[in-house]
Regions:
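Nucleotide phosphate-binding/pyrophosphate-handling subdomain across enzymes
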Residues: 42, 180-185, 192-203, 207-211, ...
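Beta-strand->loop->alpha-helix junctions that form or flank phosphate-binding loops
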Residues: 73-76, 238-240, 252-270, 289-293, ...
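Hydrophobic anchor at the beta1->P-loop junction of P-loop NTPases
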Residues: 44-46
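C-terminal helical cap/extension that packs against the catalytic core
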Residues: 237, 241-259, 270-274, 308, ...
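Active-site-proximal loop/hinge segments that shape catalytic or ion-binding/gating pockets
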Residues: 452
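ATP-dependent carboxylate-amine ligase catalytic core
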Residues: 4-8, 18-41, 64-113, 124-140, ...
Length: 467
């Protein structure tokens, strides 16, 4: 009997002993078996600590408004796995995802190439460049870290949940005859599964401290990992003014063309409802993004720079239409819960918390801001709380244990923070914390729910149900 999408997801979760295992060898080998080529005529890969999802959303919306056929791959999802794969403005259907998972599973367990589409060989150490190819230029399926043959090559390939999903998305894109595919990095960049694909343009939105167990505990180390998505002789768009020197050194070392916010392109305010984007050869006045945080202008500007770097003609009207229409769930998303305003945001590190704090200051309410906060155990929760200290009056700490070993209880969370947050009430889950905050909210108050994608997902399930 054929598996449903949920049965496939349950199966995939059990196929690798670790939820995260960085490295490209397994994914490359499976891609070779699937005969995966370049997933679209043009590819943009987007990495960074914060702003990846928003930047992808802006790129997709602008390209769609220009009439391009676009596919996007993002993670994690909030309510449905289908959110991760979008094709021509819609989420992939259950049936499409099931077909893709079936193809990946067949390839994973078969040593022979079985996929359809353009077959490409994964170039390994000692291979000669393709005809007409510069010696340092990678193939569509990447050679960024010359991979030795896998131990036991030809046998079943163990894939993590993310690797399996990445291959499924690439398989779907290859079937869809797309003009542009936009890939969001899952973790880091250099060893992330999406990095088997060579982009025409790479983007690094921001670099800040997060995922220290995997990427390092300072911006230079983390920047080095993220810079691994850059390619020789290709544009690397940098969405912040003070990128770590490790990013710039890597770009210089491989011959990537760094396109930097603040020097190669800028954004500047025009009036309360408009702003201007410009580079050396192009200038356009645009409406404020529908995504409302101040940082979204930088994300939108970075998206425009990425599309400009593709060197394809786009009508000016598409930029304005895309900026004005791009949306993304879980980013300062507003709800009304029985008369109380509720804002949900996936921010989960100090940099994101600083941006969130700036937005709260810019959008004051007459009453209090009550915060429902739950976070994964490996996050800098004290740094997050410190960034919001002046904007939140009451804290409702929630346990986040349904996600397994990465979660933590409200008591554990309270032990890692100080001040008003440490003295906040503690609750069994996000639902209980949100209900408690709603019970204490007065007419002029608002509730902020934040701390992780899991926190927001639990809140959205409640808010969409109207409970």
């Amino acid at each position: 009997m054929a598996r449903t999408l949920q049965e496939w997801l349950d199966y995939i979760e059990q196929q690798h002993p670790k939820s995260i295992e960085l490295g490209l060898e397994r994914t490359r080998e499976a891609a070779e078996r699937l005969s995966l080529g370049k997933p679209a005529a043009h590819v943009i890969t987007v990495g960074g600590t914060n702003g990846k999802g928003s930047t992808v959303a802006f790129i997709e919306a602008i390209a769609h408004a220009a009439g391009l056929k676009v596919g996007t791959y993002t993670s994690p999802h909030l309510l449905r796995y289908n959110e991760r794969v979008r094709i021509e403005g819609r989420e992939a259907s259950d049936e499409e995802l099931v077909a893709a998972f079936e193809a990946v599973e067949a390839a994973r367990s078969s040593p022979s190439p079985i996929g359809r589409g353009v077959g490409v060989r994964v170039r390994r150490s000692g291979d000669s460049p393709a005809v007409g190819q510069k010696p340092s230029s990678p193939n569509p399926v990447s050679s960024t870290g010359q991979a030795p043959p896998l131990e036991g090559e030809g046998s079943d390939i163990p894939l993590t949940y993310f690797e399996f999903g990445t291959l499924a998305a690439l398989w779907l894109f290859q079937q869809s005859n797309l003009d542009l595919v936009v890939l969001e990095v899952g973790l880091g960049g250099r060893l992330d599964a999406v990095n088997i694909v060579d982009p025409d343009v790479a983007v690094i939105t921001t670099v800040d401290i997060d995922h220290v167990d995997w990427l390092g505990n300072d911006r230079e180390s983390i920047g080095f990992e993220k810079a691994g998505i850059a390619r020789a002789w290709k544009p690397l768009v940098l969405g912040e003014r003070d990128s770590p020197s490790s990013v710039l050194r890597h770009a210089y070392a491989i011959g990537a063309n760094a396109v930097r916010l603040g020097s190669d392109f800028i954004h500047e305010p025009v009036d309360e409802s408009h702003w201007r984007w410009r580079d050396a050869g192009f200038e356009i006045e645009l409406p404020n993004p529908k995504l409302s945080a101040p940082v979204q202008r930088a994300n939108a500007a970075t998206a425009i720079a990425a599309l400009r770097a593709l060197d394809i003609e786009l009508p000016s009207s598409a930029f304005a239409a895309g900026i004005a229409s791009a949306t993304l769930p879980g980013r300062l998303q507003r709800f009304d819960l029985h008369g109380t305003p509720v804002i949900v945001d996936v921010g989960h590190n100090p940099q994101a918390a600083r941006e969130l704090s700036a937005w709260l200051r810019a959008e004051p309410v007459p009453g209090r801001t009550l915060a429902v906060f739950a976070a994964l155990a490996d996050k800098d929760v004290q740094g997050v709380v410190a960034a919001l200290e002046g904007e939140v009056s009451d804290w409702f700490l929630a346990s986040l244990e349904s996600v397994g070993t990465r979660g933590q209880s409200a008591d554990e969370l309270a032990s890692k923070v100080s001040g008003a947050a440490a003295a906040g009430s503690r609750h069994a889950d996000v639902r209980a914390a949100l209900q408690a905050a709603r019970a204490q909210a007065h007419a002029e108050d608002r509730i902020l729910v934040f701390g992780s994608f899991h926190t927001v997902a639990e809140a959205l399930a409640i808010l969409h149900s109207g409970q």
